Amino acid sequence: MHDSEQEHSSITGCRVTYESTIFYNEANKFSIIVVKTNDPRIPLQACSGRYYGDRMLRFTAVGYELPRTKAVELELDGEWVESKYGYQLQVEQWQEIVPQTADGLLAYLGSGLIKGIGPKTAEDIVATFGPDTLNILDNEPEKLLQIRGITEGKLKDIEESYAESRVLRNLMSLLGPFKITPATALKIYQNFGPACVDILKKCPYDLCQISGFGFKRVDGIVRKTDNRLHSAERIKGAVLYTLEDARSKSGHLFLPSEDLVKETLLLLNAPIPIPEQRVRAEEVQETLRQMILHGAVVAYKQYLYSPRVFGQEDDTARMIAERLANISVAENIESALEAVRESLGITLSQKQEQAVRTAFQHGLTIITGSPGTGKTTVLKAIIEAFKNLHPKGKFALMAPTGRASRRMAESTGVDEARTLHSALGLGTGEEVGDGERVRFVDADLVIVDEFSMVDMWLAQQFFKRIGQHTRVVLVGDPNQLPSVGAGNVFYELIHSGMVPVTVLDWIFRQSKDGLIAYNAKFINEGSTKLYYGNDFVFVDSPTQIETARRIQDIYCKEAAERGIENVQILSPFREKGEAASEQLNRAIRERVNPFRSAEEEVKIGSRTFRVHDRVMQTKNTEKVSNGDLGFITGITTNSKGERLVQMDFGGDRKLTYTPEQLAHVDLAYATTIHKAMGSEFETVIIPIVKAHTIMLYRNLLYTAVTRAKKKVILVGHKPILFMAVHRADISKRNTMLGERIRLYCKAYHTERNALPGLQQAG
């Protein structure tokens, strides 16, 4: 009998048989299943209350990659957890117990667990090899070619599927102390390949390369069985983790050797209280020398890179220098310019004309300027001039985000502008393997807007896919926040001194949105002499609680007048007090979209979504991009009992989401300023509170203000606003892209004169 009085938190070696599936997600292999057992250790509260004739206990198990077949017994290790659905076993490790009888082998092989083997093939295999079947699969799989219907291609599928299953089980066993999920084990397998178990046995610190395995976590567990504090493997793991931490958190492509040694020592010695036992700087320096010698770290001057990041920067600099070295045929633009003036009915300023000319005189050019300085007009002129010069030519418009690309298409009057990921064939991910085939962009002219959002990795992918004879025009505002990813590509290109740059600095917007453009210019210059009026408003509020309350009132009023889709709250923080975006989202939703019925809402963990909610996609998919905004239009229940959520992201992008897909959706009445990069809204509301001062720099405020097309409302304490305006962001990202471009240009013996980085036209 199971002991109902005993406290149950975990169980190991629990033998069960699969009974039924409650839920299964094909995308991530997460499943909720009912299993049966006669194990007396099962807690009473976990057992099904129904009576079964076989007198076996039924309970619910949840986990990843759980076999859903009655052909094998399972041995489960896990923890008992209480959820809103009841007491469940959260499976941490499992293994199949395959019966050695002919019937057992037949059931196992024919269960579909091994790709390439169906019921008929399973019969033939067991009939041929009998009790030696599993030994054949383990050690001599090529003998399966004797079986009719198993080709070389099918054998490869069988080997890969069986090997992956076996490696994952071994990996789960090896990494048991880390309490990883099978999904994480799969991630490790995909990163290191079939040899992952051997690799991690030899050097467990390689786990630090996997997201979620920080050095401290890995080190704490490794030292329980291997307390060699001064081992080269431990020091190497700390070095690589320190470089990656600097890249992901601070945007640095490298660390100076002195800083790397210092930060690595802090990491290594944090758990060592006795000074005499601590790792010395000389030991880290010696390990670094060996890592450099073997290519595990790249040294450039006194700067140290991970090989992958060094390759991104160096490869990009080389491609840019090659593009600049290719003497581009300058085109006679004057007649085309005259045609543009007539067709568009516009008069271009000297700077704007110079920007158009430069685009057709060089293979790579940059146009910069703050809002209201006429960048869109210049883009229209370049497109029209290109059509005039090349009636059969092809051009492509791109931007880093879906919203920015759609805005680019709307403002220029072009049918289509695409995200960089889509145009470059990068799919929805953020990494591309070295062996992957490169797809070149088929265009004679490529224009990219919002290029300041492009990080080092994406810049490399972009230039790799643009032909050397394609003219490239990069457009952006270098005074905005740098890219979310590592590097400072746009700034480095501008200040390399090698790329022709036209700066548009005359504000043309003189009417209803004039104050926004002028005040953005003043903020960028560090001036607090801002003009206030109907389109640029400051609402004084001394405390964060009061600020949050006033923002809610203002939002409701503005949304009623302009529509929810045209009003956006932009906060410096996602989670920090009442004026952070998460807290504002919950408060505002209760006012503009309160609870109506259980049928019109769905709960995912601690989050709730309702019909009519304003939402944001937070991960790229084939249909929608990270940062896209939309509305929930309906919530239904399918035949399996799953709640399905209907979304409308505009145009033909009407999609249905499963509960798992909602993990990549947030409420979006309020968002962070970083998330709004590349977007524009009619009205923007910005909290300015003391609690956010750690983030309030000039470029953050400037970025928030320039998201507004018609109205900016600042709510908070004016001294905090002035502090932000005066506070230049002094944090510099470590990158040598500009210097590397100059060195490559020199190496290619560029014949033309080096153009000044900030070319003043006119």
Predicted regions: what they are:
Residues 1-332, 762:
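Accessory, non-ATPase domains that flank or precede helicase/AAA+ motor cores in DNA-metabolism machines
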Residues 113, 209, 369, 399, ...:
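The Walker A (P-loop) glycine that initiates the GxxxxGKT/S ATP-binding motif of P-loop NTPases
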Residues 345-361:
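N-terminal pre-P-loop "Q-motif" helix
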Residues 628-762:
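C-terminal accessory regions
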Residues 374:
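Conserved glycine(s) of the Walker
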Residues 361-367:
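Pre-Walker A (Motif I) flank of P-loop NTPase domains
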Residues 366, 377, 381, 385, ...:
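Conserved helicase motor core of SF1/SF2 NTP-dependent helicases
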Residues 478-623, 633-637, 744, 757-760:
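Conserved helicase motor core of P-loop NTPases
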